[in-house]
Every structure is written in structure tokens, then in C-alpha cells.
Amino acid sequence: MKLKLNVLTIILLPVHLLITIYSALIFIPWYFLTNAKKKNAMAKRIKAKPTSDKPGSPYRSVTHFDSLAVIDIPGADTLDKLFDHAVSKFGKKDSLGTREILSEENEMQPNGKVFKKLILGNYKWMNYLEVNRRVNNFGSGLTALGLKPKNTIAIFCETRAEWMIAAQTCFKYNFPLVTLYATLGKEAVVHGLNESEASYLITSVELLESKLKTALLDISCVKHIIYVDNKAINKAEYPEGFEIHSMQSVEELGSNPENLGIPPSRPTPSDMAIVMYTSGSTGRPKGVMMHHSNLIAGMTGQCERIPGLGPKDTYIGYLPLAHVLELTAEISCFTYGCRIGYSSPLTLSDQSSKIKKGSKGDCTVLKPTLMAAVPEIMDRIYKNVMSKVQEMNYIQKTLFKIGYDYKLEQIKKGYDAPLCNLLLFKKVKALLGGNVRMMLSGGAPLSPQTHRFMNVCFCCPIGQGYGLTESCGAGTVTEVTDYTTGRVGAPLICCEIKLKDWQEGGYTINDKPNPRGEIVIGGQNISMGYFKNEEKTAEDYSVDENGQRWFCTGDIGEFHPDGCLQIIDRKKDLVKLQAGEYVSLGKVEAALKNCPLIDNICAFAKSDQSYVISFVVPNQKRLTLLAQQKGVEGTWVDICNNPAMEAEILKEIREAANAMKLERFEIPIKVRLSPEPWTPETGLVTDAFKLKRKELRNHYLKDIERMYGGK
């Protein structure tokens, strides 16, 4: 075996030599053609600084230091004006695209379950003028049905072109839009609809039949239900008192000259644009009130961090439009003339679960240049690719490692490796269509390991952002020239960020070498508070002597010398153990989530106990293979319930924890393996795949009692 390895090493020597010669030959022309010197200078420069020398002073971007930006396009101070600007500028250009469903097939799985597989065609596009026509018709139709300006209308629907058309209609006709995640359970949906007093509801046939039908009698205000699909439904199956319309019929009503001739009642910057219900990661969903001016300011900051955003770009929309990251990203893309092709997590790639084997996923067909992703999705891509690498033979694996390490070294220097991109990473890059030039990550922290992998294998910068629903998604985003990891960038030009002491957690603005504390964001992008919840609004929001709004995030951050922010903790994730040690559950999870045997993990601790426990969704393929090697037989549920498999997971947890330098008391010493994945549909994670700790605790209550010695 040793002789074989030596021979292979000798064979691979020319590869090292080729890379060395190539680097020497290509470096000088590449250096000047790509303006690498300027990019390196941009990466190393100060990006934000405090407004004064006083500790705790807010940090601002150096590119807009004297004042905060509140508007991007002159005169476009409301969302409807942004829409009109885009329509007049890009008229006949492709705007919103949807793939045709050619056929559906039922496919039997080895476990006996039947999955529906899709065979999809090409994208069919509406241009800007066609979208505008549909918006006008739909708005006139809603008005004809009796909807008045400033009266709320709710949308409970999957991400699709009709969602965006409905939203733009509401912005233009001054109908405050109440947004609800399509994955919310019955109780949360009923709460949102009743609290917002929405009398009109936009939804899909699938959600109407699967979730709403049984909830309608509990909903007090809704009188009109509009479904977006071109399908027929049996209205007799629904309770009396509801008028059910198709979106097409409402548009046809609005297209009548007597209705279309009535001009819309346009909004002002201080009018309510959206009441966005959160995903409920910390309890019952809260409605966040966003004025037009809040969203305009937030998107002004976000767009500044995406250089070259324009008509040459194609964006793939698949995240929930009820999430502020996806909604502001799509509105920004629409404003700048980018095509938006719609997708879903189940059809995104060739390997996605709803794509029939041999058919093409949405990325392959659309070939997007821009996309947003939550870390959970990037983590899956990373694990899948690295799993394929482990299955390669020695030469292939070694070639990949040589190329990966070489490019990683170049990236850290601020350079690139075009030969590696062409020969090694082209196939990996093709997983997302091959043309992605920038990805935006948000919703949760992205691990440095996954961040580096995406940089290397997908050959593009990752704009890691930090923002909240309450800040209209705007806070920070890393610049494209900044290839550091573990940080979320400098404050956007629309806001300023300060830290305040959190003594209980041991974080202060006077900490050395860098100030640390709770992150507080200020600017016009800060929303107006929580809908019908003055107590919580007063707790989390404040207004300073200059009239500027601030939001206390509950996240703990650290400012680096160049003005970039790092998220280091979360107040609600900190638990004090029986012996007095503090454990950050989020920190533990982030350290262990990239273990090959682990798909997802939730750490848990109680203040009356002395140790941490965990719930783990194991990687089915890897754990099944390991079970075979250990002689463990049975179904997937049997494997997950086997103490020997729990021991193997705990062994990997200890190894990863030691490698990440976790303290002894931070390492989980007991584990419960979950055979079922945590998805938004299970109610155990949000649509951004954030853990719902309360729901997870309730779900695993008996296991918690068992692992802590309860009877």
C-alpha cells in the first residue's frame, strides 16, 4: 500500500509542477486585467468607523458617513414609484418567469412511499409591460369587489410570479399587505388573519384545500378568498359566508373599462406597505409593520452592496416571499431590470426531490447569475459535494484536494485560480447553472467552512448579510472584495449600528481587543413596531432625541478594527448551567453542524442541570453505511433508536467539538437521534431553517426527561 501511494505521489508531481508554471505565467496578465491590486486595497481598507471617539458610538459605512441613505432612485420614495420606474425603463424586457409543467408521475420509493415527480419545460416569461397590465387589472378588480385603500389584504401562498404581482398591486393601490409563511400551521395562520383583520385573502388551491378549509370557521374577518391557480374548485365544499374567486376572474373583472378607468389611490412614504408576520421561531408569530419609507431605505442599502446589478442579471426566486430577505431581493431585482425565474427547494437542482431522474432542475435551465440562500441550503450543497469527493478514487481525490487547497490559498491572498475553475470546479459550479456571479446568504450565520467551500467551488463571492424582519432585512452585508469568513460585513449605507453592554453574558463595549455587546440598529429602515403589540414594541424599539428609530436585536456582536461586524452570540441562546458556566447553544450547534454524520442539530441545556444534551437529525446515507459496518440491522427508525449508533454520533460530536475548541462543559454528552428530518412543514424549524427551540423542546420532552434522568 505504501509503495502504491509513493507511485501515485510521483505521478501527481507533474500536476504540482503544472500549477506552479501556470501560476507564474498567468499571474502578471491576470493581475492587471482583473484590477487585483485595487480589489485587494478595497478588501483591506476601513469599511466603517464610529461616529465619535466615545465608547458605544454607532458605526457607519465610510462611503456614506455624513448622513444615512434613505432613497436610491430620485423621486421613487414609495414602492409603487419603484415599480412604475422599472416598467417605464424596461418595458418589453423579460421580467417574471415560470416553468411549464409538462407532466406529473408517481414514483414508488424503496420504503413504499409514493413521491410525485415533475417533468418541466422551459421558462415562460412575462415582460414588464405584461406584469404592469396584470397589476392594473388585479387592482381594479379588487377595488370593484369592494376593497378600500388602507384596508388590509393577506397573502398566504407559495413563492411564485402571482405572489409578486399581488404584492405590486397592493403597493400601487395602497392596500397594506399582510404576509404569512406558507408553512405556518393552522393556529398561526388563524392568529395572523384574525389579528390583522384582513377581509381579503390570496392563496393557492393546494393551501386552500390542505390548510385553510378546516380553519375557515375560526377566521372572523375574511370574506373574500382569491386563489392564484388556473384551476377549478368545488365551492360547495366550503362554508357559507365566503366568496371564492380565481385570480384570473378578478383580473377579468378589473379589465372592464368602467373599472379600469378608476385611478388607484396612491400611497405616501408614511403609509403602511406590509404587515409581515414572523416565522415564530421564539413563539407566536408577530406582525412587523413596515412603511413604504422603511422598505425603500432598506433596499437602498442592500442594492449598494451588489455591484453591477442590472438587466444582464437573472435571479432565481425560491425562498419564501413572506421572508424579508427574499421579498426585498426580488423587488430590488425587478427595479433594476433583472429577470426573476421562479423555483422551489423541491425543483431547484437536477437532484431535487420533485425532479424526475434524467430531467433538468430549475438552476440548470435558468442559469441564474444571482441567488439568495439560507445557510442550511449551502450546508447541504457542501455535504453532498464532499460526499461525492470521498467516493472518488485516490488520484481523483488527490487532484481535487490539490486544486482546492491551491485556490483556497489564492483566495486568501485576494487572487483567483482560473485553471482550477476551468478544470476542477466547472462541474460543481454547474450544479447551480454555471453562471452564478454572486450569492447572498442570510437568515442565520454561515459557517466559515461552508463559506470557503462556496467561494472555491462555485467561483463567486458570498455576500453574507445580517438583518432582521424588524430592520426590513437591512443591517450589514459583506463587500464582494472581502473574502474573510465568520463576519457579516460593515453597516449598510442606510443604517448605523451600535453595541450596548450585556453584563449578564459578559460582553461590554470596553472589551479588548474589540468592543462587544448587544447589536442595536438605527435608521429609516427600522420598521414601525409590532402590530397591535405596544408592550413588545416599547421593549424592543426606541426613538432617540433626533427622531431616529432604533431596534435592539438580542444578538451579540463584535466590531473588528476595519468596521466589520461579527455575530458571536444570542441572548436567548445563553443558558447558565448548575455550576455557573454559561453555554451558548447557537455556538455549540454552529461548531458541530458540519459533522459528516449530522444533517441538523439542536443543543439543549437546563439551568438546574450540569451538562448539555442534543437532538440530532443524522445523515441517513452515512449513518446507514456505518450501521452496516458495525453489524447493526433494521429499519431507519431502528438504526436511529440503537444505542450503538447514538454512541457513534457522540464520538463524532466529541471529535468535532475538540477540533473547534469547545469547552468541556459545552460538549453534549447525550443525544437523541431523529429519523425524521426537521423541515418547515414539521413546525420544528422556520422557513429560513432556524430552529424553533420551544417546539423542539415540546417535541422531545420525554427524551429530555430521559436524558436528564427523569422517570
UniProtKB/Swiss-Prot annotation:
CDD domains noted in UniProt: LC_FACS_euk1
Cytoplasmic side: 29-711
Biological process, per Gene Ontology: alpha-linolenic acid metabolic process; embryonic process involved in female pregnancy; fatty acid metabolic process; lipid biosynthetic process; lipid metabolic process; long-chain fatty acid biosynthetic process; long-chain fatty acid metabolic process; long-chain fatty-acyl-CoA biosynthetic process
Catalytic activity: a long-chain fatty acid + ATP + CoA = a long-chain fatty acyl-CoA + AMP + diphosphate; (5Z,8Z,11Z,14Z)-eicosatetraenoate + ATP + CoA = (5Z,8Z,11Z,14Z)-eicosatetraenoyl-CoA + AMP + diphosphate; hexadecanoate + ATP + CoA = hexadecanoyl-CoA + AMP + diphosphate; (E)-hexadec-2-enoate + ATP + CoA = (2E)-hexadecenoyl-CoA + AMP + diphosphate
Sequence similarity: Belongs to the ATP-dependent AMP-binding enzyme family.
Disease: Intellectual developmental disorder, X-linked 63: A disorder characterized by significantly below average general intellectual functioning associated with impairments in adaptive behavior and manifested during the developmental period. Intellectual deficiency is the only primary symptom of non-syndromic X-linked intellectual disability, while syndromic forms presents with associated physical, neurological and/or psychiatric manifestations. AMME complex: An X-linked contiguous gene deletion syndrome characterized by glomerulonephritis, sensorineural hearing loss, intellectual disability, midface hypoplasia and elliptocytosis.
Protein name according to UniProt: Long-chain-fatty-acid--CoA ligase 4
Any Pfam family matching the protein: AMP-binding
Organism field: Homo sapiens
Membrane topology type: Single-pass type III membrane protein
Phosphoserine PTM sites in chain numbering: 447
Gene that encodes the chain: ACSL4
